Swiss-Prot record:
The gene is rplF. GO terms for biological process: cytoplasmic translation. It comes from the Bacteria. Keywords: Ribonucleoprotein, Ribosomal protein, RNA-binding, rRNA-binding. This is Large ribosomal subunit protein uL6. Belongs to the universal ribosomal protein uL6 family. GO terms for molecular function: rRNA binding; structural constituent of ribosome. Part of the 50S ribosomal subunit. PROSITE patterns: RIBOSOMAL_L6_1 (PS00525). GO terms for cellular component: cytosolic large ribosomal subunit. This protein binds to the 23S rRNA, and is important in its secondary structure. It is located near the subunit interface in the base of the L7/L12 stalk, and near the tRNA binding site of the peptidyltransferase center. InterPro entries: Ribosomal_uL6-like (IPR000702), Ribosomal_uL6-like_a/b-dom_sf (IPR036789), Ribosomal_uL6_a/b-dom (IPR020040), Ribosomal_uL6_bac-type (IPR019906), Ribosomal_uL6_CS (IPR002358). PANTHER family: 60S/50S RIBOSOMAL PROTEIN L6/L9, LARGE RIBOSOMAL SUBUNIT PROTEIN UL6M.
């Protein structure tokens, strides 16, 4: 039995989960998420819990069981608590600022880099060098944060670049002179 898949998902009182076959809609105080999950899985919904049940013990069903449960749990957590990723800009003159809902990064290029806020994503800039990406979809928040980091990933010699908060950047020693 999948250790992740057999866990029962607790649903907070302010969140509603509705199933239409394999299509799931989760509504909560932070927003609403929809997704089509694996059609082979069945869902047992009771008052405050949902259990994902797999049809057989085949290898494919065992792997999909845990994945389906994790996706559904992430949706429930997203609409109730939300997700947030924090990025730090490290480097002389590196800064971020808001322009409406969009994010503008000055990270050593000849031009500022503009990142559009997708629907359901909000940016917050603190102290010009810290960017917070938040939203209800864990997948979307992670993808946007990764796109921001890829604008100027941290380099190993001086450590300059955009990094996740708490990310360890392995440093290298420079060339030694003759």
């Amino acid at each position: 039995m999948s250790r992740v898949g057999k866990k029962i998902i607790d649903i907070p009182s302010d969140v509603t989960v509705t199933f239409d076959g394999s299509h799931v809609t989760v509504k909560g105080p932070k927003g609403e998420l929809e997704r089509t999950l694996n059609e082979r899985m069945t869902f047992k919904q009771e008052e405050n819990t949902v259990e994902v049940v797999r049809p057989s013990d085949s290898k494919e069903d065992r792997t999909d069981h845990g994945t389906t449960r994790a996706l559904l749990n992430n949706m429930v957590l997203g609409v109730s608590q939300g997700y947030e990723k924090t990025l730090e800009l490290v480097g002389v003159g590196y800064r971020a600022q808001m322009q409406g809902k969009d994010l503008v990064l000055n990270v050593g290029y000849s031009h500022p880099v503009e990142i559009k806020a997708e629907e359901g994503i909000t940016f917050a800039v603190e102290k010009n060098t810290t960017v917070k990406v938040s939203g209800v979809s864990k997948e979307q928040v992670g993808a946007i944060a990764s796109n921001i980091r890829s604008v100027r990933p941290p380099e190993p010699y001086k450590g300059k670049g955009i990094r996740y908060q708490g990310e360890y950047v392995r440093r290298k020693e420079g060339k030694t002179g003759k």
